[in-house]
Amino acid sequence: MIFSRRTGLKGTLTIPGDKSISHRSIMLGSLADGITEVHGFLNGADCISSMNCFREMGVTIDHNGDTVIIHGKGLHGLQAPKETLDVGNSGTTTRLMSGILAAQNFKSRVIGDASICRRPMKRIMTPLSLMGADIVSENGNDCAPLLITGKPLHGIHYDSPVASAQVKSCILLAGLYADGETSVTEPYVSRNHTELMFDAFGIDIKTSGTTAIVKPADKLYGQKIMIPGDISSAAYFIAAGLITPDSCITIKNVGINNTRDGILEVVKMMGGTITYDRLDQPGEPSADITVQTSDLKGCVIQGSLIPKLIDEIPIIAIMACFAKGQTVIKDAQELKVKESNRIDVMAVSYTHLTLPTNSLV
């Protein structure tokens, strides 16, 4: 991609692999029998944390560039870690892995950096405890470090108070080991990478509206996984192409899962010029996305759209500053409990840039 003050942004680019799918490929590949081959793996610190945690539990994982080969241990083949499982800054690793650890035949301690040790874990501790898990907060504050003693689990139906793919996935992963059916209902549909990957690995998973239902698994089968580019990373280039004068850029092989494509919907709501050519390839749906400089207009973003773009709200707020009229973002409270309070950070940062914003709620 080329940038010039005279010609704007021009050209094509490829972005790194999807973070959510990368995490899940490590976890399910580790629990499968046989080899799982992953292409397009995201080499970010969070995904490496997932990889290292499962290595600590005896899984052999070969890593070369964006290719990962996982030598699965089977559903019941994980070994007790010799050290504390350090998730770094990864909330996804913490919450999803806890669902797996709750059913193992060993004890484990899960810790992360200072940010992780402030993030709320009661949202997974409650449903796991209802399933029979022994999971406690070491400091008694419902945050990491977490102490988990594996126990036999039983299936439950859980009405989640939040639309969170991490909470849902934690429960579904525990459900693989539970006695009986496990189901989760959310207020809105959250991203469904776990459900799609469950299906690919041969797990009995069904969805109906905002409910996901899993039956206990006997065996998972190693797979070949092709990971598309992360739409959350693409969002920054999409925004740049829309607001930079005289621009036209194409972003290759971007994941357009319909539980993650909220940014594309917002661009259309704001009047942006965007097209995408769907790709015919294995794995989750993907496309080459092209955007051009556009005159944007304000819009209202709320409700069921929020879980589809929760990680893209900071860049959407930037787009809104270049749009004609007011943009309102509602129902975004989840941003307050990320690695930082993203709402406050956005409000303060944009004030320093003299951009007109009020705090989002």
Language-model features and meaning:
Residues 197, 203, 236, 240, ...:
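A structural feature that tracks compact, well-ordered secondary-structure segments
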Residues 1-43, 71-116, 147-188, 213-256, ...:
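Structural motif
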Residues 54, 259-274:
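Conserved loop->alpha-helix
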Residues 46, 50:
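N-terminal cofactor/phosphate-binding cores enriched in small/glycine residues
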Residues 132-137:
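A glycine-rich helix N-cap at a beta->alpha junction
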Residues 351-357:
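Conserved small/polar residues in nucleotide/adenosyl-binding loops
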Residues 62, 171, 275-277, 318, ...:
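Interaction-mediating elements
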